[in-house]
Amino acid sequence: MNVLLISSSPHKQKSSTFLLAGEVLRGLREEGVICETLHLDDFKVLFCKHCEACHKNLLRCSLKDDVQGILKKMLNADGIVFASPNYINQVTASMKALFDRSAHFIHCKRLFNKYVAGVVSSGSGQNKEVLDYIAFYGHTCAAQYSGGVSALRQFGEDTKAEAFKLGKKLASDMKEKKLYPDQMQIIEQGKQHFARIIKLRKDDWQEEYKYWVEKGWL
């Protein structure tokens, strides 16, 4: 099993966000999971132009940056940990840009059978909305959400233990291929919604339509 940590703090390895995420990775590694870390600040991530190139030709994009490589790593992972500081009750701009650029993942539910977890830090402690948003993104891509952990910039041993436990839980979910009934209901509703859209736009988005047919979803 392998997990990809995508961290969007501009402070990278020195950030509270990454330090907290590191405890999640420690829990994962103790269970034998191979972990890789990407700091978004090391990559060029442009804003989505809504050109629809990724819908017409899978994983293609008119923008020339590093996003396609990141998306391929996401596809190759069994689980993904999204870690972000709280920027006005939202993920950072770079993380949001990455989410927007993965629109094809949403259309074609490309994180189906994968697992997502969230890590958030802030100065205010008002992090629930950000974790909820990470969970929402995971569900729109058809992933199971194993949970999240959040903390103030200065956190203690209890919070570290919570993050470590989350890593263990993520590893267990992946190993057991755990399905959460309430989440599956949300995912199924999303599939029904996009099934209608994909059929409606099948002439414009031929490769996405073909993907759905090959999956047996249409």
Enumerate the language-model features and the residues they cover.
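Short histidine/acidic/glycine/proline-rich micro-motifs that form metal-
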Residues: 10-12, 87-88, 121-125, 152-156
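Short beta->alpha junction loops
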Residues: 39-42, 149-154
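Short, glycine-/small-residue-rich phosphate/pyrophosphate-handling segment
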Residues: 93, 106, 110-151, 159
